Amino acid sequence: MALLVLGLVSCAFFLEVNGLYSSSDDVIELTPSNFNREVIQSDSLWLVEFYAPWCGHCQRLTPEWKKAATALKDVVKVGAVDADKHHSLGGQYGVQGFPTIKIFGSNKNRPEDYQGGRTGEAIVDAALSALRQLVKDRLGGQSGGYSSGKQGRSDSSSKKDVIELTDDSFDKNVLDSEDVWMVEFYAPWCGHCKNLEPEWAAAASEVKEQTKGKVKLAAVDATVNQVLASRYGIRGFPTIKIFQKGESPVDYDGGRTRSDIVSRALDLFSDNAPPPELLEIISEDIAKRTCEEHQLCVVSVLPHILDTGAAGRNSYLEVLLKLADKYKKKMWGWLWTEAGAQSELETALGIGGFGYPAMAAINARKMKFALLKGSFSEQGINEFLRELSFGRGSTAPVGGGAFPTIVEREPWDGRDGELPVEDDIDLSDVELDDLGKDEL
């Protein structure tokens, strides 16, 4: 096997991003600073693509998305969000893969997923269909745009997901809960509280949906529930505090738009979320999907089960799961396989020469990788991953310049390996020479 020469090239290629759209396009670039104003408060129908610059599918969609934007100009708004750069905005709408396209129609707080084709014609057809539905909704009395969310505090339907707390219910609901709570202390006469209310209500619904109820938004009338107001030193309105199990409450000091609130809530959720999945490479679909949908995929090649047994393998997997949890905010993919199970993958990554276990981090967009040179231990892997996150290290092209062929195989059953059983040989009919007459 030809040696793969590892050039001393900066690992910054892993983190390099370039937007796919420019100001000269008819595609409107959206960011956390303008999304609420441009999309949510707009009466227009919007098609929004959430993309990552390194995503191959996104790059292939780009010319078609631009074509659709030009065709729909002054009819339907077509936008794009660099969700790799603006994680909070992508997380706010549950974006887990790229590209994700959402249609913001009559109910801007509940966009629909676009499931159609990836051609300009298919996108335009879907947009016009959604536009017809928007007009029908308006004829039927449903209003589009932001005004539908601006209801007073007396309208319970607008704040159905905001949990009202009192002196009597607070401790049981909040302090005894395993969930994260964001609590607004308000006064009914407070103008700032009235301005915050529709944003808080809209955020509560989105956060509930995105976190499956693991982060809750609540409200306390501090003029009535004075025990709570005194306990937490409420001096002005509105005051928002964050409560987490076993920790002292902290003040929320972020922005007061729905987007800002949701962003902070999702950060809190990710801090308490489970680690990413650590998947065994048993098919080409698993390997390619994990690597293509993430900026990096971390691939571990563990020793053969006969060399470690189940206990030894599980100890390696525990280390990998621990580190996947530590680096979960990076949104990397995590894969593992057994030595010899995916020989073409090992060859392409130059794995095996250093023995097993081994690890490589792959950038599937650029078909380059970085190889773990240190020890396959928690400390050694952590140093390797930390260097990657800082954009440092040595890289090399993936052998063959393309994703290697993956062999389909059965997943590990969790048990120790077994040596193949050898057939017993019947020696009863074999004539053996007299040992005393052996000749040299």
UniProtKB/Swiss-Prot annotation:
Residues 20-132, 124-287 form the Thioredoxin domain. The gene is PDIA6. One of its GO terms (cellular component) is melanosome. Keywords: Cell membrane, Chaperone, Disulfide bond, Endoplasmic reticulum, Isomerase, Membrane, Phosphoprotein, Redox-active center, Repeat, Signal. The modification Phosphoserine is found at S129, S156, S158, S428. A motif (Prevents secretion from ER) lies at residues 437-440. This is Protein disulfide-isomerase A6. GO terms for molecular function: protein disulfide isomerase activity; protein-disulfide reductase activity. It comes from the Eukaryota. The lineage of its organism: Eukaryota, Metazoa, Chordata, Craniata, Vertebrata. It catalyses: Catalyzes the rearrangement of -S-S- bonds in proteins. It comes from Pongo abelii.
